[in-house]
Every structure is written in C-alpha cells, then in structure tokens.
Amino acid sequence: MAIHPTAIVEAGAQVDPSCDIGPYAVIGPLVRMGPGNSVGAHAVVTGRTTLGASNRIFPHAVIGGIPQDLKYRGEDTALVIGDRNTFREFATVNLGTAGGGGVTRIGSGGLFMASSHIGHDCQVGDGAIIANSVAIAGHVLIEDHVHFGGLSASHQFCRVGRLAFVGGMTGVAMDVAPYCTVAGARGELAGLNTIGMQRAGMTEEQVGRVKQAYKIVFRSSLGLAEAIAQLEAELAGHPETDHFIAFLKGSQRGITR
C-alpha cells in the first residue's frame, strides 16, 4: 500500500494493502476498501462506505458524504460500491437515509465524470455512464448500462430502465422505459437506443421484439394498461420484453411518453 505522508487514514478504516492513497486524501474511520483501489489527491472517502476492488477516485471527489436531505438526522446509513468504477474530479456520492432504505448502492464498471452527483438512496446498476455535471436526485433507480449526457438531471424517485439513454441537458421527471432515449429540457421521448442495444450484444431478433413493444406502447392510441395487456399477450416469454413489461407495470411516477 502506498499512502502519501500527507494523507489521513483515520483509525478504524480497513484499507487493503494494495490500495494507493494520494496527497492530502482523507479516508474516514468507517470506510472499507477492497484491493486495488486508488484515491487521488485531496479526495475524501467517508461515512460507512464500502468499496470493492479496483475503483479509481480522482482528486477532490467526495465519496460517502452525508445526504443533502433536510430530514437526515445523522442516522447510521451506508454507501456500497462495487468494482472497477471511476469517479472523476469533484464527483460526489452520498450515503443513504433511514427513510430511503439506508443504503446508496452503485454497481460495477461505471464512469462518473467530473462534477457529477449521485444523491442519497440511489440504486445504480452496472456499467453506468454519468457524464459531466449530471445531477441525480435522491431515491433514483438507474438500471444496468444507462447513459446520462452532460448537464442532465433526474427528479427524485424516478426510474431509468436498462440501456436507456438520456441526452445532454435533459430533465427527467418521469420514469424512462428500458431501451429508450429521452432528450430535451422536459425529457421527451426520442426513440429507441438501437446503437446501445447492438453494442450490448442483443441479437436482431431481440432488438426486433423491443421495437414491436415500443410501437405498441408509444406509437399506438392505447392507454398504458391496454398496451401492457397487449404486450403480455403478444411478446411475453422473452427476457428483453419481459423486463420491459415488468418495468412498465412497476411505475409509480408514470412513463415518459
């Protein structure tokens, strides 16, 4: 382990010997860090934060800070981060709150660009790409392989489905269905993330079924309940469309249409 002489690793922190801690970095007493993590100059990892392996935290990032929530009263909450994530300069990720389950979670293989923010109680899947200055409010669910363009934002409690793409400077105020693209100041539906599906290795048949589902929900005159019923009748039994159907049925805020 390489700990710079100016870094502070507080008593109680459990840091794997293979980690690198840069100049003036601060590691709090409740932090648990697995092998191969690196923490850059002036970065802070604090709170009850657990990191897996091979995460990179760049200078001035703050990982595990207390929630930006007026209801937070200092309760013991946590942040759990997987493996191989990158948190660029000034990125912030907050702990959970008692009112939101107590744990903020981030999967593996994500890129959180400079000045991006992940709020309290968010659940972020694998392979997220969160671009510069993106603001994700509390309690947001982001499924696997979601992309947020720069300067975009999500309202609290929204859900963004697998392989969705949120364009730059977009405000998300309702759920974004899996495989879909939204863009514009008010987060309007802009089609399917076909390139993302192809890059994820989905077959032509799978992409074709998603296109059928998209047309039923978003390009017909059916109400959402009627569209879901038609999806279940015509496209159930395939993982990609089963997930699409389950996501629609689980929406509390409504679907971006």
From Swiss-Prot:
This is Acyl-[acyl-carrier-protein]--UDP-N-acetylglucosamine O-acyltransferase. Belongs to the transferase hexapeptide repeat family. LpxA subfamily. It comes from Anaeromyxobacter dehalogenans (strain 2CP-C). It catalyses: a (3R)-hydroxyacyl-[ACP] + UDP-N-acetyl-alpha-D-glucosamine = a UDP-3-O-[(3R)-3-hydroxyacyl]-N-acetyl-alpha-D-glucosamine + holo-[ACP]. Pfam families: Acetyltransf_11. Coiled coil: none annotated. The gene is lpxA. It comes from the Bacteria. It is an enzyme of class 2 (transferase). CDD domains: LbH_UDP-GlcNAc_AT (cd03351). Its EC number is 2.3.1.129. Gene3D superfamilies: Hexapeptide repeat proteins, Udp N-acetylglucosamine O-acyltransferase, C-terminal domain. It is found in: Cytoplasm. Involved in the biosynthesis of lipid A, a phosphorylated glycolipid that anchors the lipopolysaccharide to the outer membrane of the cell. One of its GO terms (biological process) is lipid A biosynthetic process. Homotrimer. GO terms for molecular function: acyl-[acyl-carrier-protein]-UDP-N-acetylglucosamine O-acyltransferase activity.
